[in-house]
Amino acid sequence: MDPASSDMGGEATGEHLADELCEAYLGDNEDDGGDELQRLSRERDFWKHMFNQLVAEYPEGILITAADGTVTHWNERFSDHMKMARSDALGEDASDVFSTAEESETLPEAVVRTGDTVEEEEPHDVPTDSLCQYHGVPLRAPTGDVVGSFGVVPDISEKVKNQRELHDLHETVSSNVGEHLSELSESIDEVGSFAEETEAFAGEEIERMEGVADEVSNQSATIEEIASSAEEVSQASQRAQDRATEGEQTAETAIDRMGAVQESAERVNDTIDGLTSQADEMSEIIDAINDIADQTNMLALNASIEAARAGEKGEGFAVVADEVKSLAEESQERADEIEQMIVEMVETTDQTADRIGQTTTEIEEAITAVRETLDSLQEIRKAVDETATGVKEVAGATDDHAASTEQVAATTDEAVDKLTELEDRLDNLSQIASEQHDRVAEIEDMVDELVE
């Protein structure tokens, strides 16, 4: 169907409104002696002036060519882009003054040849070192014949810059976060392994302490025969002393390893703070993209208004304005999606930080429990020393020996209780480490999704 005859109802309405705009002008300048020819001449001058004003005052570069490629309109904004005076460009062939990425023909020529809207696929450099992108629509006569092209050439340097910065930031986040998450995962695995090893140690110590308790109970039961079995009691005391010494050494080792794990947890917290800071930087870039999209929407709105005022002659320009507006809205929607992903990543990171804090607390409590166990072991060793001394003085110190034996039994029971508590705490710590490992995997998935 001939474009000039399509959608007649809509065009009639637009022409009527445009006529009212023109009538307002003609009514103010009506000459009682004027004939129809003069009126048509003034109407022609009115629309010509409106068109030229639109081209001259439009905030982006405008390039209009005739069907043969001759430049007919070239506004000052486009002169700024191309570093070429308007007077030097008018009347020249478009291929001589405006080169594009197309090799076989210029984009204005493609618009005239196809009779369709043409948009440059990739932006190109202009003499001002800016990046521009051509959008062209065909200009049609009332018969529907293409008589030229109307091109808008906006400066998209800032938009491209922001897109490149966002891409670079994606790459940085992917690299840095991946490295930090790997370290975090290793630290959590280390916590889990340490917790399992220490839990096993606690179980062994419980068995040892129960054995010591049994031995001390046997000593207490046979206190009346201590004179005849002094050597046996002395040997048992020595074994208890050796085990207490081993327990002290093991407890000190456990304290050192827990301290190292606590430092790892603190480094993980610092890493999470760094992730939060990078998320804030991404939010700032998203805000900048949203601002640019808002400004682009405003330009598209102004262009639509000017196109409505221009009536049929601005129809092609309205198509360009709608396309620019659609691009701006799509950019804003993508920015909002990325911003939501950042918010979710920050929330998950904050939860991870809380769990790490809980892990640190559990480690501190475990260190306290081990220190208490160490104190108990030292008391056991001291009590065993007293027992050994009592054995040597068995003849005159039977009552003292019995009291020392009871103290060893009580202290051993206390050590068993402390080790049992430590075993429970380490089991809880192992569960927390497993949960943290799962959370790290979730963050890694979110980062991969964000980069994609």
From Swiss-Prot:
Methylated by CheR. One of its GO terms (molecular function) is transmembrane signaling receptor activity. It comes from Halobacterium salinarum (strain ATCC 29341 / DSM 671 / R1). One of its GO terms (cellular component) is membrane. Its main location: cytoplasm. Pfam families: MCPsignal, PAS_4. Residues 229-239 have a biased composition (Low complexity). Residues 229-250 are annotated as: Disordered. Residues 47-121 form the PAS domain. This is Transducer protein Car. Interacts with CheW2. The keyword Repressor does not apply. Mediates chemotaxis towards arginine. Probably transduces the signal to the histidine kinase CheA. GO terms for biological process: chemotaxis; signal transduction. Disruption phenotype: Mutants lose the chemotactic response towards arginine, but they still respond to leucine. Residues 180-416 form the Methyl-accepting transducer domain. Keywords: Chemotaxis, Cytoplasm, Methylation, Plasmid, Transducer. It is found in: Cytoplasm. Belongs to the methyl-accepting chemotaxis (MCP) protein family.
